């Protein structure tokens, strides 16, 4: 068991007195009474200068809180962004993003992106959804929404959503009418004896399946040959 370090001669007298009182010592040491009667008044042990250490610690703390300058030169603003084109934002893009996020399968439908003269929009009347010279798609919803907004403020989100919902429901009606018309036409043609050839997808699946069957036969033959050897 570790003992407390004696820092002064008076500690020896106190410790010895306690041991005598507790019975640890059966008799007083020879020097006990002389030491108790003439206690030392001067401590010759070197003590650390706590005030000096406190000042050093305070000075180190002040250094940590000082402002440290890491650059010898001022920071220069990079000018490369000044020559980049300005980001253009249109309300039509916002409507397209909403529509195709809600109707991802519309992106799978074939689209005509080439115009005959480049001014087909001149002959389009967006007071109604159906256009004789344009196929029904997501762009129809966008243009119809813009037409319904009219002169209203573009930042009016409530008016924008109302116009979009109206154009969207008109789109649904025309899309369902197209589907019914296509199904009816196919049934009528089948009833009158029309023969429909296989589509490109069906032909590709047929050739793919044939390749798989050929590979399966060759794999079985190779397996049997290796087993016989």
UniProtKB/Swiss-Prot annotation:
Keywords: Mitochondrion, Ribonucleoprotein, Ribosomal protein
GO cellular component: mitochondrial small ribosomal subunit; mitochondrion
Principal location: mitochondrion
Keyword Isomerase: no
Record flagged with keyword Thylakoid: no
Pfam families reported in the protein's UniProt record: MRP-S25
Entry's localization field: Mitochondrion
Molecular-function GO term, any one: structural constituent of ribosome
Record text on subunit structure and interactions: Component of the mitochondrial small ribosomal subunit.
Record family assignment: Belongs to the mitochondrion-specific ribosomal protein mS23 family.
PANTHER family to which the protein is assigned, alphabetical: 37S RIBOSOMAL PROTEIN S25, MITOCHONDRIAL, SMALL RIBOSOMAL SUBUNIT PROTEIN MS23
Protein's name according to its UniProt entry: Small ribosomal subunit protein mS23
């Amino acid at each position: 068991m570790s003992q407390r370090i004696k820092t002064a001669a008076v500690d020896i007298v106190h410790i010895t007195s306690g041991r005598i009182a507790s019975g640890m010592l059966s008799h007083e040491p020879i020097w006990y009474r002389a030491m108790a009667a003439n206690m030392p008044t001067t401590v010759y042990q070197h003590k650390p200068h706590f005030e000096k250490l406190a000042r050093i610690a305070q000075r180190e703390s002040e250094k940590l809180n000082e402002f440290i300058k890491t650059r010898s030169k001022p920071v220069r603003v990079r000018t490369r962004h000044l020559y980049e084109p300005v980001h253009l934002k249109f309300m039509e893009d916002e409507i397209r993003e909403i529509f195709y996020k809600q109707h991802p399968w519309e992106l799978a439908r074939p689209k005509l992106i080439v115009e005959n003269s480049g001014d087909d929009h001149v002959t389009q009347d967006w007071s109604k959804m159906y256009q004789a010279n344009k196929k029904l798609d997501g762009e129809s919803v966008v243009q119809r929404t813009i037409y319904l907004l009219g002169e209203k403020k573009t930042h009016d989100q409530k008016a924008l959503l109302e116009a979009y919902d109206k154009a969207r429901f008109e789109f649904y009606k025309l899309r369902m009418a197209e589907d019914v018309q296509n199904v009816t036409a196919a049934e009528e043609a089948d009833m009158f004896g029309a023969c429909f050839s296989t589509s490109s997808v069906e032909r590709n699946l047929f050739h793919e399946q044939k390749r798989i069957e050929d590979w399966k036969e060759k794999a079985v033959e190779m397996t049997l040959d290796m087993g016989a050897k």
